[in-house]
Amino acid sequence: MKILVLTVNTRPSNNLEVWKNSASRNGYEYKILGMGEKWKGWAWRTQKYIDELQLQKNIDIFILCDSDDLYFTGSKSEFLEKFLNYKTNIMIGMEENCCTGDESQEYKNEVIRKLKKIAKEKNINTKYYFPNGGCVIGYRTPLIELLKENITAKDDQFGYTLLYKNDINKITPDYYQDIIGTCVQSIKFLEINKEWERYEDRVYNSLTNTYPVIMHFAGRNFNNYKRFLHSEDRKISFSPKIEIISYGRHLHDNLFLIVIILIIIFILILF
């Protein structure tokens, strides 16, 4: 089966070189969309994916993913074997503590309760409840249909969340980090809890007992991204500034906290 990795990235960076190296090393073919263009938001990225998928009629499976905070750890053959075992049209990465979007916290809490209820009803023992838009995998036609449904979402990640909440058969969550590992924890947390560990050049999740073939360090988790890099990629300088500009999805979730901190600092200066 033919597999193609698609990413949208508007500028060269060392992080992108890590992504490219990891894809090539593990046997994946890839295409970068949007290079040299101005970043215009998540809906724009969704449309980029739709346009490319409509052109790529000879590819069986697509991996749509970030490329500034993500890299491949397992081979294409391992990926294919795992994905086919799920017998699903679409799979999405999952994380434990991020419900994005500009909706009210009350509404988000309702969504969170629903996501946890879905997992419980499926007898899924996990803490990874929340879809992460940084890696979506699937077959061409179902992906196009999903992306078209999600095109109006200002935040594509929250859009995927609502689509899954309203129809649990539409997307298969990678609850156990089997294919897509999403690491958002701090280094201090990992040192204490050992949730994610590095064995040679693979990353292991001790909670799910899995070795993902794709690792995504979401939420500007640059320190762990660098910490878990493949030995060959450690030779490439790490440049976190790119993600803050282009992929600051989690940034708006922390704006309130940032404002409070600034107010406290201002008061301390005055007194």
Predicted regions and their residues:
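N-terminal anchoring/stem segment of glycosyltransferases
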Residues: M1-I61, N85, L251-L268
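Short polar catalytic/cofactor-binding loops
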Residues: V8-S13, E96-C98, R220
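Generic preference for well-ordered alpha-helical elements
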Residues: L16, A43-T46, D69, T73-K76, ...
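Short, aromatic/basic amphipathic alpha-helical patches
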Residues: L16-R25, S104-R113, R227-D233
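Short beta-strand-to-loop acidic/aromatic patch adjacent to the donor-nucleotide binding site
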Residues: D60-D68
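Catalytic core and acceptor-binding pocket of nucleotide-sugar-dependent glycosyltransferases
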Residues: I124-R227
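Pan-eukaryotic secretory-pathway lumenal catalytic ectodomains of glycan-active enzymes
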Residues: E195-F266
